[in-house]
Amino acid sequence: GKLLLLVEPGTPEGYGVLRGIREALLRRGAHVLAPCPHREACPLPPGEWCHFSCRIQRSRLHKMAKGGEAPYEDEKFTFLALSREPVPQRAGGRVLRHPYTGKGYVKLELCAGEGLLQKTVSKREGALYKAARKARWGDWLFF
């Protein structure tokens, strides 16, 4: 199947553009590959938007143009990957925020097939706890 990948700035406006495109293409039979794990309406409440961050190295010219000294920049973006072909629903969910790691537990905010989830994973959950500790914003966590 063909893949359509759309990327916009990680702003409310960029997210709004992709949310509208997502809704229109789903009505025409497209299938979401990422970041959403479902075909339902976005579960994020008004005022929040789905976005991710990627650290990129700055060139000398980039540093001069931005007037910055740091050798990197954290670029925020939002994206949408769609296919014409159906995709199987995966167990788990996409990590929407930086996980909070406490003593013996990890708290995560996830977008999953059943909507928005607040999940706490304890040390007693073994392999899932190890995966949750390593999970980063934007990762897929199987559970």
PLM region spans:
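Surface-exposed, flexible loop/turn segments at secondary-structure boundaries
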Residues: 12, 40, 87
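Charged, low-complexity, helix-prone segments enriched in Lys/Glu/Asp/Gln
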Residues: 1-2, 18, 68
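Active-site-proximal structural scaffolding
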Residues: 14, 18-19, 75
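Conserved Class I S-adenosyl-L-methionine
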Residues: 17-41, 46-59
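C-terminal lobe and adjacent flexible extensions of AdoMet/dcAdoMet transferase-like proteins
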Residues: 52, 56-143
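Conserved beta-strand signature within the Rossmann-like core of class I S-adenosyl-L-methionine
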Residues: 1-13, 31-35
